[in-house]
Amino acid sequence: MRVPSVTLPLLVGATALAACVSGAPVETGPPNVPEFKPAFAGQTRAEAVATRTPLQVTEIASGFDRPWAIAFLPDRRMLVTEKPTGHLFIVTADGRKSPPVAGIPPVDGRGQGGLLDVELGPDFATSRRIYWTYYEPREGGNGLTVARGRLIDGAQPRIENLQITFRMLPTMESTQHCGGRLVFAPDTTLFVVLGERSIMPGRKQAQDLGSHLGKVVRINPDGSVPRDNPFVNRPGVRPEIWSYGHRNILSAALDARNQLWVVEMGPRGGDELNLVQRAKDYGWPTIGYGEEYSGRPIHRSTQAPGMEQPVYYWDPVIAPSGLTIYSGPLFPEWRGNLLIGGLASQALIRLVLRNNRVVGEERLLTHLHSRIREVVQGPEGALYLLTDESNGKLLKITPR
């Protein structure tokens, strides 16, 4: 059901404008780990910036049980996943929801698991194939799985010709740090981001090239391994691996130069923005900028030879989920900016980049007091968000 829109002015008043001019950061609270210092200027607490365009927030639909992802169909309807139930819906522009799409396999919806991302295949116009990630119940535990199938439209939509194209290994019993975002590259290869399962045996495997845990992997649409992957034909190494040393990535997107950006959740402190490159080690759990939730240390250092530094980090954390790099016509001042959903921060986080460095940060939509799970740019240039709650909402953001 479509409801009346609510218009929210953003960062108005002398204080916000002064912050933009004075160089003060958005985050002014004390860090969790004050002894950890940035490796270079601007790596954290960038200067506050302010969007000049007033924003209008329109609720398109509600009643989702912890929705997780949005993908646009060519006719501007949306696919929306519901995490714990394993339901996939088709939603019209005016908020009408289909019955759950039939043929989605059972999910393990406990904790951070369930039905996660969904994307249209690169050949969707002819094949009608969609791809999705989910936590698959398995003997001995569970694990992230990539599936694809043909979407059959109609009064009772369904999936036909289901195929499993990738299974994260090893299987473990854990409901945390699932990862799960999908990103198709222009060459049709598919990046899949994978968490390290949170538990100690999994955490250690983020540095183990014989494990998929804590990795970004790259596969072909049918699940085969691209011949130019960096670890092909290396004994004992998973050939799908593209990069490693990650903790829990819930945000991933390509920019205009086809660079892969990810935002990953840190522990207590140390959320990271990383520019992912082939064969690189991003350090977890050897280095980082956070600590255990108990306050105990994790890392002896924030730097180590052969390990990449984050482009940016947050302490305290924002709890990032969802990422789009804006390229539309409705918000010219946002072009090339990263827009990140914030769960614990209950905000839409905007980062301004220059030469692959963060030069400005903004927290938007804090008036909503909502955990933002997903951020997607629509075909017309509007932003579409999902709120992470038992009565989750699909919101549309346009200029007022």
Could you tell me what each predicted segment is?
Residues 237-272, 277:
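Repeat-solenoid scaffold signature
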Residues 246, 359-379:
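Conserved blade-ending motifs and adjacent loop-strand segments that build the rim/top face
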Residues 1-10:
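Bacterial N-terminal signal peptides that target proteins for export
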Residues 99-113, 161-175, 221-242, 285-315, ...:
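Surface-exposed loop and turn segments in beta-propeller and other repeat-based domains
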Residues 200-211:
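Acidic/polar, solvent-exposed loop segments in beta-strand-rich repeat domains
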Residues 145-154, 209-221, 276-277:
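Beta-propeller blade signature
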Residues 9-19:
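Bacterial N-terminal signal peptides
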Residues 21-200, 251-254, 259-266, 316-354, ...:
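Acidic, Gly/Ser/Thr-rich repeat motifs that build Ca2+-stabilized beta-propeller blades
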